[in-house]
Amino acid sequence: MGMTWKKGKLLLARAPKEARAKFVLKIKSLLRAAHAGREKLIFIDEAHIHQDADLGHTWSRRGQRYYVASTSPGLARVTFFGAYVYNDRKVGIWPAARGNALTAIDCLESIRAAFPDDRLRICWDGASYHRAEEVLERARELSILITPLPAYSPDFMPVEALWRWMREEVTYNHCHATAAALIAGADAFQIKANEQSDVIFKRLYVCTGLDPEQEKLRIS
């Protein structure tokens, strides 16, 4: 058997296999509804982006070390909400004080204000504040349907790819001295991304299947 040197890839073994299989059927149904124009399908996720640089490879002169200047912001970070409007191939990114029930409700209200006449469905993960009764009650008041992802299943969240893309463009080998500078970088990235709807559709791929070999490794 041929061997090669590989970097390990994290697999969340506690993800519930049965719930994941059911979600595959659900997401296929939701995508059909979105394609038919019956619902506006929106994926929502939160991320904590550090002001300090994410170090990585880049082109530099041979024989010279490549230095990335850092103002040493330490663990300073900004919480962002990210939205992927599947029907429109558009994304939204905005800062929040933190991820909690209040900011989740603000998110729902902003989404409804942006699409006042659409039948809305939001997919997000099972964070405790997403499941808070006041959040679910506000969603009902706003006539927003909520579909939670299975536990330990970030592979079903396309906004995870948005965060990777944003880090490549905004924090990769670049330190932001202030939160305001990082937020400005995120704003510029959002504008640039929304000029590339085809790239958004490809990069923010919505998972509609499971790898049987991977699912065997889960312990649930």
Question: Where do the protein language model's features map onto the residues?
Answer:
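Conserved beta-strand termini and adjacent loop/short-helix elements that scaffold enzyme active sites
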Residues: 8, 44, 94-96, 125, ...
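Short, hinge-like loop/turn segments at secondary-structure boundaries
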Residues: 60-62, 140-141, 163-167
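RNase H-like polynucleotidyl transferase catalytic core
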Residues: 65-73, 141-161, 174-175
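C-terminal anion-handling pockets and recognition modules
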Residues: 37-41, 160-220
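Conserved short alpha-helical interface segments
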Residues: 1-15, 40, 47-49
